[in-house]
């Protein structure tokens, strides 16, 4: 019995360091621009992160949000970032990331609008509006206009009524 307690302790410590090591490796790959490799590391280590503590899970969710943003999966990124509001682990990084996220969403919506993908543009502009409803009311107007251009009048009316 005396041998099992230290063995269990060392396994737990090794497990914790393994989680942090994989997360740091994925963060470094993301920072160097290798988004696919960072995503692959997170997917392959998903079972390892299931039992992680709250700090590691918050950092993992933040990185997953950044990866989703760079893959232009804005809905997923938004839900990841929203789940982190009020979390002390990433509270210093989140406002800056949300500003960059808002700019990326709006730029993507503008590109969609120029390409004639008005429905996609409308949904992205509505997402940008939802980031800060007080200061981004103009995005709701543009989302409604894009919905009109996409001939989705019910959605446009919904957006106009929300104004």
Please report, for each region that a protein language model flagged, where it lies by residue.
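A broadly conserved amphipathic alpha-helix scaffold signal in soluble, globular proteins
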Residues: 82, 110, 123-126, 161
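Solenoidal tandem-repeat scaffolds enriched in leucines and small polar residues
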Residues: 132-133, 138-163
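N-terminal leader/linker segments that initiate helical-solenoid repeat arrays
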Residues: 2, 6, 16-103, 107, ...
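Conserved structural position within tetratricopeptide repeats
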Residues: 47, 86, 129-130, 162
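Alpha-helical positions within canonical tetratricopeptide repeat
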Residues: 37, 76, 120-121, 155
């Amino acid at each position: 019995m005396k041998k099992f307690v230290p063995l269990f302790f060392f396994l737990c410590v090794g497990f914790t360091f393994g989680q942090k090591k994989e997360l740091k490796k994925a963060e470094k790959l993301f920072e160097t621009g290798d988004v696919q490799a960072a995503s692959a590391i997170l997917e392959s280590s998903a079972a390892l992160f299931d039992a992680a503590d709250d700090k590691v899970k918050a950092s993992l969710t933040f990185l997953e949000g950044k990866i989703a943003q760079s893959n232009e999966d804005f809905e997923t990124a938004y839900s990841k970032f929203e789940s982190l509001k009020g979390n002390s682990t990433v509270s210093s990084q989140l406002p800056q990331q949300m500003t960059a996220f808002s700019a990326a969403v709006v730029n993507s919506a503008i590109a969609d609008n120029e390409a004639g993908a008005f429905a996609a543009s409308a949904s992205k502009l509505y997402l940008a509006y939802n980031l800060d409803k007080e200061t981004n009311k103009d995005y709701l107007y543009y989302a409604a206009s894009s919905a009109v251009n996409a001939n989705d009048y019910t959605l446009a009316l919904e957006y106009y009524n929300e104004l």
